[in-house]
Amino acid sequence: HIGAQTMGSNLNTWLNFLKIWSTYENIIFRFTSGEFLATRPNAILYATPLSNTFWEIYNKALQEGLSVNEIIKTLGKKRNAINFLNVNNLESFDHYNTIEFRCPNATLNPVIWQNNLNLFTKLIMRCKSEVDSLLIDKRHDELVKNGIPDNLKLYNETINLRQALEFCDLIFTNNLDKVYFLKQYLKSFKISIEPYYRAKKFTRTI
């Protein structure tokens, strides 16, 4: 959970968030599978991919001039990769006023906790500034042509190094952050669709 006030009420921040998540969700899902090579089997029920939904809402917001509150209302399902139902005030520091990221696999590894938290917080902070919309549009068009958005099977079976590097450069300014992200995303370039199949260890023991 991350405080909703971190996102704030600026419309461009929310539009950037929808656009970036929609375009790089396949990268994010593989990363947040943590020490496992695939997302947990019940993710399709309890952390449903949002790529297509976010893209539709993004375009609707542009065409119809939706406000941030109207955007949030359209995202009101709990069992998605991100749960916005607890968002009640975009300026409040209330303990329960949170955005819940549900896509990560459960883990007892504190390094993976930190990596996941670092990704989500840096993603939100990046959305507060200008992004390369033309690049993101181009990448999203390529994904659609290949049937990738919302396809959890392809999220698990595909490693896209070029897209992952692009995402790293978009989100992180620190090279060490990029290294930690790529280690957890690439997982020694191994792929498995079997649930709970562990990747080769990529974190130090704490």
Residue ranges and their predicted role:
Residues H1-Q5:
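Histidine-centered catalytic micro-motifs
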Residues M7-I206:
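C-terminal accessory/tail domains of diverse enzymes
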